[in-house]
Amino acid sequence: MTKVVVTGAAGRMGTQIVRLVRATPGLAVSGAVERAGSPAIGKDAGTLAGGEPLGVAVMDDLARALAGADVVIDFTSHEASVRHAQACAAAGVALVIGSTGFTPDAKAKVAEAARKVPVVLSPNMSVGVNVVFELVRQAARVLGDGYDVEIVEIHHKHKRDAPSGTAVRLGEVAAEALGRAPADALAYTRHGILGERPPWQIGIQTLRGGDVVGEHTVFFCGEGERVEITHRATSREQFARGAARAAAWLPGKPPGVYDMADVLGLRGGK
């Protein structure tokens, strides 16, 4: 049985993850962590997730929760995820990170922790989205430079980072498939008199509002036709399901940074 610690266990994603982990054969919730001062401290993680008691009380001490654990699932913030990665490295516990908004410095710190333990770091744990990454890769390769690539994403009004990590990754995938450097190709939310669109550019537009779980569309705009690849999330459950799948896959792997393409066996599509 793989023992799983869930951080942010009382949040919207954390409660979904607790439910999915307890429903996944071979996985068990062994620990639940929240920030210091959270009203969830001391409460049963299973009850907070809307189910039967698990006998696992939420605590604010990750180091203590890691004792005897095999893997941590972390959907908190990129700042907290860096601290959690460092704690996991010190304890020798694998880590699945679904947080977004990572700066280059934060990613470097996660990579440093991954020299000691295996880490899955993915901007989107949804199986469907990771299939979309591969579809975009193939479409960009086949359609080539004759099609302009644009990306539009929309999320709920509470999402703090923009654009979404998924939108950025979609742009990176398209750029790499077209032989372009993402740092040069990606353009975010245009404004003003900019002149004609550069042919090498990949635009990313961000919308926020309501309770939209997440929607991403990649447009390949050619002369006389347009190809659209869209993923719509209607529930956070698919993110939790993907995270549980990653948690079952990761323990025992060599140290290093992995993503959902590794978990799903999609590397052959590169």
Curated annotation (Swiss-Prot):
InterPro entries referenced in this protein's UniProt entry, alphabetically: DapB_C, DapB_N, DapB_N_CS, DHDPR_bac, NAD(P)-bd_dom_sf
UniProt superkingdom: Bacteria
Pfam families: DapB_C, DapB_N
E.C. code: 1.17.1.8
Disulfide bonds: none
Annotated NAD(+) binding sites: 8-13, 34, 98-100, 122-125
Official protein name in the record: 4-hydroxy-tetrahydrodipicolinate reductase
